[in-house]
Amino acid sequence: MYNYIRIAFCCFSGIFLIACQTSRPVRWTGKKAVWQSLPSLPRTNSSDSISLGVSGHFSGITNGCILVAGGCNFLDKPASDGGVKRYYDSIWKLDTAGMMTGQWEKVGTLPHPVAYGASVSVSEGLVCIGGNNDKQSFSSAYLLSWNAVASQVDIIKLPELPFRMDNLAATSSANYIYVAGGNKNGMPANSFLRLNLNQLTKGWEILPDFPGCARLQPVLVSQHYDEGTQIYLSGGFQPEVYNSKPFIPTDLLSFSSMNNEWKLESAVPVMKGGELRTFTGGCAVSKGDSLIYFTGGVNYDRFLSAISMNRNLKLAEKNGKTSLFSRLTREKDSYLKHPVAWYKFNKEIFIYNTFTRKWAFLDDNEFTARAGASLLLLNKYFIIIGG
């Protein structure tokens, strides 16, 4: 079972890179159709292909600079041609002052090459949590902080997670870091934990699991009110586990720190044609005291077909449906070879108002039609990196 899950997810992450692999971050002012490109990540040598763009990276803003660390891509050839995924440990910095004309600078390395972890910016720096590479999954957590005096990135070790986690999501509120979803010791889980940055000796606190299916590659955001913190979880997917059908949620859950409970917050808006929508592999960021911006992610129908492929092949073979088995085999073999537009990555931007509990469409643009990217908030700007 473990091997099947890993194979299914490799297909998932590979699509991200084929469809929208880019090293040029994009700055969006929050107004319709106002987009600007930031400098591209450079190639440092012939063996470092980060200039091709990365997916599943850590990113955040600290001490007047943008940090991008880790991530993965395909060095020699794309996944559709049998390419091998490469994982990185580089840490890159771009000063926010003059970022439109500035240059990225390599300022350090992570403890290990890693992608598909979770990261979140706090006042002290960028917190990086979990992740995996081609050899293992990680329980590590550490803080990256730009030291302007020493012109270096300081890496401060934080308490390790109680188990190995990857393909999870993270957010912060007040002095807490929250993480949810992903794989737990290699298996999809409903895990939900938090770390008090003011009481590190207590380590990670295990909170109530979120309800429903497990969620790999979800999005997680928070809003802090006088009464406490509200956490919002959407997207993600559950592959075939214990003979259950793969499942992609199309809802938004919320967790209240006041009563320590999860609830169904809202359904996600459907597509223009009435098809289901998911923010799986997408991005979300909160702004102000009531707004959450959602961008990107996979197409529900396309991705459900992909993660159901192995199960459907087994059933067709078991039931002697040779023509169906042949057709599904052809579809599986060609899945990574379609033109970019075929994958239908979400290009719409939606806003959810946590006070009114209503959704509003804001804009659509090909810049947001990506998955495995990161979305940062800098004053009045949104910055989309990688994917």
Please provide the spans of the model-predicted regions.
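C-terminal motif of bacterial Sec signal peptides marking the signal peptidase cleavage site
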Residues: 18-19
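Bacterial N-terminal signal peptides that target proteins for export
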Residues: 1-8
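Alpha-helical hydrophobic membrane-insertion segments
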Residues: 8-14
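Kelch-like beta-propeller repeat domains
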Residues: 24-387
